[in-house]
């Protein structure tokens, strides 16, 4: 089963930013920064589909003149849609 059907990306990503989405069955994808994923259970614009739970880990690093001026890491877990 595919983790999700499509991904929408915003152009001009920040340097050093990335997101990882993985499901409980081990499938996943590494995306560029400023990525947007939208999904739901049975919606018309479902992007993320999972038979179990999934997690989203994001790290954001902002560089100004080669100096890291901002770093932030996020971790979220969700219950996926039953199939």
Swiss-Prot record:
Transmembrane segments: none annotated. Pfam families: Coiled. One of its GO terms (biological process) is sorocarp development. It comes from the Eukaryota. Belongs to the hssA/B family. This is HssA/B-like protein 43. It comes from Dictyostelium discoideum. The lineage of its organism: Eukaryota, Amoebozoa, Evosea, Eumycetozoa, Dictyostelia.
């Amino acid at each position: 089963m595919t983790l999700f059907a499509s991904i929408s990306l915003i152009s001009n990503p920040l340097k050093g930013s990335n997101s990882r989405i993985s499901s409980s069955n081990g499938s996943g994808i590494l995306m560029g920064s400023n990525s947007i994923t939208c999904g739901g259970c049975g919606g018309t614009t479902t992007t993320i589909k999972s038979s179990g739970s999934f997690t989203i880990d994001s790290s954001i690093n902002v560089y100004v003149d080669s100096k890291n001026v901002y770093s932030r890491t996020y971790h979220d877990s969700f219950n996926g849609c039953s199939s």
